[in-house]
Amino acid sequence: MAKLSKRAAAIAKKIDRTKLYPVSEALTLVKETATAKFDESIDVAVQLGIDPKKSDQLVRGSVVLPAGTGKSVRVAVFAQGDKAEAARAAGADIVGLDDLAERIKGGQIDFDVVIASPDTMRVVGALGQVLGPRGLMPNPKVGTVTPDVATAVKNAKAGQVQYRTDKAGIIHATIGRASFGVEQLQTNLAALVDALQKARPAAAKGIYLRKLAVSSTMGGGARIEVASLSAN
């Protein structure tokens, strides 16, 4: 058996991977094992009771985390006229149309979120091969294709996260940083879980929230007792 590193050994001593922890205890343990020299992200994985092979059971959307993400977000907006001005006033970092498209085609992708007004999709649609693989393609399901670009910009800046089920029916999302307090992380997790509950597909049968686990970038992961979510 391979010898555990000091970090892994310390984590294994503190977190029992076979145990289900109440949500507050799980978050506390994950924070305590996030000992890297940078502010590690705190991530959650949620196993949903869906059939990911069926298109009518895929879960996708976005939610604004009440305590934010702890990350500075750069936002690019495809808009023109009054909508472009509204986007700038809301705090967008880059606003344009054909010029922004050329910038992206040239490989200058220095932003984290792309928002588009519906009337610009004729231009944005041609960028699918560039933006799609990076998870940046605007989509109405997550609120990034909208006539209200100003609100979309404010949401992105305020800590909005996008989520979608992977091929195994699991949602992966960041709910904050190791520097956050347990209550902040718990509030963000509750907001995400609430959004997932509201996005439950009508065709999904049986238990919907099957498994939850939280982890940090370099630290340990702890499984959460699902029932403890509603108890808080």
UniProtKB/Swiss-Prot annotation:
Molecular function GO labels: rRNA binding; structural constituent of ribosome; tRNA binding
GO BP field: regulation of translation; translation
Keyword Ribonucleoprotein among record annotations: yes
Annotated S-S bridges: none
Keywords for this protein: Repressor, Ribonucleoprotein, Ribosomal protein, RNA-binding, rRNA-binding, Translation regulation, tRNA-binding
Record bears the keyword rRNA-binding: yes
GO CC terms in record: cytosolic large ribosomal subunit
Domain of life: Bacteria
Matching InterPro entries: Ribosom_uL1_bac-type, Ribosomal_uL1, Ribosomal_uL1-like, Ribosomal_uL1/biogenesis, Ribosomal_uL1_3-a/b-sand, Ribosomal_uL1_CS
Known function: Binds directly to 23S rRNA. The L1 stalk is quite mobile in the ribosome, and is involved in E site tRNA release.
Family per similarity comment: Belongs to the universal ribosomal protein uL1 family.
HAMAP family: Ribosomal_uL1_B (MF_01318_B)
Quaternary state and interactors: Part of the 50S ribosomal subunit.
Protein name, entry field: Large ribosomal subunit protein uL1
Phylogenetic lineage: Bacteria, Pseudomonadati, Pseudomonadota, Betaproteobacteria, Burkholderiales
Gene from which this protein is expressed: rplA
